[in-house]
Amino acid sequence: GLIGPQLSAQYYETGYNAYRSEDYKAAIENLSKAVIYDETNKDAWLSLGNSYRKSDDAQNAITTYDKIIELFPETETARSAQRYRSQLAENTAQ
């Protein structure tokens, strides 16, 4: 079991740095791998959802936020996902 979380952490770090540099394509590539290697990596999930949102991919963002809400109920991460998801749903409805 240790290899997955370690790989996840590396992909998360690379992906999060890409996200902060507004390179959302690289962020999505790395963060997608981070959540595959460790499904419990809440930060990677949230950054992935945010990367989709920032690259105007509302559909994937909403899917990712839904997954966070399902995986981590009653957490601050899920509450953040719910807020972003609500904003997107409103924007998409307009």
Regions found by a protein language model. Give the residues of each.
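Alpha-helical tetratricopeptide repeat
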Residues: 4-19, 46
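Start-of-helix register in tetratricopeptide repeats
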Residues: 6-9, 43, 76-80
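Canonical tetratricopeptide repeat
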Residues: 13, 47, 80-84
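Register position in tetratricopeptide repeats
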Residues: 20-21, 54, 71, 87-91
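Conserved structural position within tetratricopeptide repeats
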Residues: 33-36, 70-73
